């Protein structure tokens, strides 16, 4: 496996574009297109929130139908959530506009939206934007990067990655882009991720690969405990690498899923670290657990604790908050057996041993917790299973961003 430059246009046959449609934002791009030169099989995972945005419902329908997909249209600024039949109709209007502009079937157009909930999309601006995107689409790495920028809302930076693998002597590429900064919580978190590959793989196998990996990547991040109405991860495969078909359970499948995991974990961590107002990526490793489920519950509980997140913001080794979060998680463990460590680029320090504080240096702990990426390692000494969750610190900036988000 090799990391390469680019994102959604790194794989063969994919083009992208961005444009400023003026949907909410002024003087910046707010629409993006991903286009495949040939039809793709598609897989998707979506929010578990009962309140689902219109694009989520549309995409679920398209993915379930088995239709070959050739384009994805995404807008930022307005989420098209809680907009009723009118909002769902705008998804169809978007697909129809893309079909007309690109000469493809509307049944194979996926859509995505992110932004303010409850507002109707200005559909005339959206369809005009689709026509512009169709004219501007290119296969360059730069067009992929600009597409990643166009889907940002409160994000501070674009998020993209691409890797290459070998499958039976053929080079297969996987590339992705994502957005997400707030309303991020495990269970498909407002986050959107779009992944493209030129692999030859069936729709069923592609869906298994995505579904199996989401639990260990996007579902292990949290910024604020709010599960969005719009969470969507879409994975397209156009087969242009001309590799021998990747079969579920084969060695090639293992290679493919390892590469997919690299993409998903990278994007998930970038979302977590770019949380609204955040100054640090906060990683939590639960180790020495008796089951994977126990490890995930403990890691998630710590990373979601607002008191712990504010301690990280203050570079304060307030370990009692972590032990407390473990205690109310629902997982069973012996608190008098827990060891806790903090780690960053500045070093590693043990804070508690067997549930009580060791004689550590507060100054050294503060130095370690002052880095832009900080890890807490909780060892319950019950087994060999581990899990990792990602979040961020909680600062005044989060309140400032969200107090006036609609304006």
What do these predicted regions represent?
Residues 1-75, 79-93, 99-407:
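A structural signal for small-residue-enriched, beta-sheet-centric alpha/beta enzyme cores
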